[in-house]
């Protein structure tokens, strides 16, 4: 079944006739493939590996190089990510470039008029399925350089490390309180293979590597900007580690002595438990004998029962009024 956004686009198929089309943003279905016979060519650019791995010929990357007669951009709740991607697309487009922007109202798509007004003409052309569809024509090209989008931060909890992050990465500008609590449970005695799952900008894995130099660090995430950020955080701090894309355990090989995570429980603007449920239910198959799963979570989330079902006893290593750090052994 196609998304609400794609259902609105289906009402405007004449836009696609005979054109080369680039789909980008938060696309989550196979709508582009259904237009193969209508368009002269189709490209898809996504920064989400959980989508890219399920579709054919998706460009999974931070930066995209290419042009098309028509760009279709699926708006997301992550405004920093939206701005980062749209500026990229506009910077390499030609004057007169045609763009359709589609998004759910609850995700803030209405702000597209203010976002794109400095660069051309924009008008709302449809409203249905609780979505808005906008047509944009480029008149003033912006300038894009990746180096201008990097943010950095430091924090007493992370010693002398500097964390690097791109737009859209979780807790991009400062250390979040959940991760800070999780880091308070880390000592300098961690050994063996460590998996920082859902690594974001790489703060957890980097802190472990800095304090336990013999630990072998692997970092994974589904977000292209997070992976690029984790790479840079490691390299700029002269730390060694492996970083690659995986949707929870989809591309994980081997077993680990410690799997550690501040797992996401938001999917766009909804609370979604799929990722953390897979993390807890499948972790034992990726842990060495005696290995540990350690996660931080909002105290109200129903993870204790899942942990009990799949591991038996669990331990709370640290807690505040809002967060708890859980530990289970294989």
Curated annotation (Swiss-Prot):
It comes from the Bacteria. Pfam families: MTS (PF05175), MTS_N (PF08468). The keyword tRNA processing does not apply. Coiled coil: none annotated. It catalyses: guanosine(1207) in 16S rRNA + S-adenosyl-L-methionine = N(2)-methylguanosine(1207) in 16S rRNA + S-adenosyl-L-homocysteine + H(+). InterPro entries: DNA_methylase_N6_adenine_CS (IPR002052), Mtase_sm_N (IPR013675), rRNA_ssu_MeTfrase_C (IPR023543), RsmC/RlmG (IPR046977), SAM-dependent_MTases_sf (IPR029063), Small_mtfrase_dom (IPR007848). SUPFAM superfamilies: S-adenosyl-L-methionine-dependent methyltransferases. It is found in: Cytoplasm. Its main location: cytoplasm. Keywords: Cytoplasm, Methyltransferase, rRNA processing, S-adenosyl-L-methionine, Transferase. One of its GO terms (molecular function) is 16S rRNA (guanine(1207)-N(2))-methyltransferase activity. One of its GO terms (cellular component) is cytoplasm. Belongs to the methyltransferase superfamily. RsmC family. PANTHER family: RIBOSOMAL RNA SMALL SUBUNIT METHYLTRANSFERASE C (PTHR47816:SF4). Specifically methylates the guanine in position 1207 of 16S rRNA in the 30S particle. This is Ribosomal RNA small subunit methyltransferase C.
């Amino acid at each position: 079944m196609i998304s609400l956004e794609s259902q609105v686009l289906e009402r405007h198929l004449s836009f696609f006739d005979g054109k080369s089309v680039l789909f980008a943003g938060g696309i989550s279905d196979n709508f582009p493939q259904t237009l193969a016979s209508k368009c002269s060519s189709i490209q898809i650019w996504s920064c989400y590996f959980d989508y890219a791995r399920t579709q054919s010929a998706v460009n999974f990357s931070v930066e995209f190089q290419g042009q098309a007669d028509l760009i279709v951009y699926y708006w997301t709740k992550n405004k920093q990510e939206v701005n980062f991607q749209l500026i990229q697309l506009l910077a390499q487009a030609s004057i007169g470039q045609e763009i359709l922007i589609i998004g759910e109202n609850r995700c803030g798509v209405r702000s597209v008029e203010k976002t794109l007004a400095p660069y051309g003409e924009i008008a709302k052309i449809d409203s249905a399925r609780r979505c808005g569809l906008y047509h944009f024509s480029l008149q003033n090209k912006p300038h894009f350089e990746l180096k201008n989008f990097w943010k950095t931060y430091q924090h007493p909890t992370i010693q002398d490390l500097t964390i690097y992050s791109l737009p859209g990465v979780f807790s991009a500008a400062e250390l979040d309180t959940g991760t800070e609590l999780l880091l308070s449970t880390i000592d300098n005695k961690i050994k063996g293979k460590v998996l920082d799952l859902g690594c974001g900008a790489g703060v957890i894995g980097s802190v472990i590597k800095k304090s336990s130099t013999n630990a072998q660090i692997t970092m994974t995430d589904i977000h292209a900007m997070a992976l690029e950020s984790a790479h840079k955080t490691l390299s700029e701090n002269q730390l060694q580690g492996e970083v690659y894309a995986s949707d929870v355990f989809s591309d994980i090989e081997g077993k680990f002595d410690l799997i550690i995570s501040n797992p996401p429980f938001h999917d766009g603007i909804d609370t979604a438990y799929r990722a953390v449920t897979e993390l807890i239910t499948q972790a034992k198959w990726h842990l060495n004998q005696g290995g540990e799963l350690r996660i931080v979570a909002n105290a109200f989330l129903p993870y204790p029962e899942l942990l009990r079902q799949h591991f038996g006893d669990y331990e709370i290593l640290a807690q505040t009024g809002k967060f708890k750090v859980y530990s289970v052994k294989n």
